[in-house]
Amino acid sequence: MKVRASVKTMCEKCKIVKRNGVVRNICTNPKHKQRQG
């Protein structure tokens, strides 16, 4: 899980999702997991 100021998709399978006011990146590749913070 990477915590970043700007969350961007890293591949074509990445999805940007907003959960409880937190922007997250979800992907099949665990290295692409991101959260805005």
From Swiss-Prot:
It comes from the Bacteria. Keywords: Ribonucleoprotein, Ribosomal protein. The keyword Ribonucleoprotein applies. The keyword Nucleus does not apply. GO terms for biological process: translation. GO terms for cellular component: cytoplasm; ribonucleoprotein complex; ribosome. GO terms for molecular function: structural constituent of ribosome. Pfam families: Ribosomal_L36. PANTHER family: 50S RIBOSOMAL PROTEIN L36, CHLOROPLASTIC (PTHR42888), LARGE RIBOSOMAL SUBUNIT PROTEIN BL36C (PTHR42888:SF1). Belongs to the bacterial ribosomal protein bL36 family. This is Large ribosomal subunit protein bL36. It comes from Dehalococcoides mccartyi (strain ATCC BAA-2100 / JCM 16839 / KCTC 5957 / BAV1). The lineage of its organism: Bacteria, Bacillati, Chloroflexota, Dehalococcoidia, Dehalococcoidales.
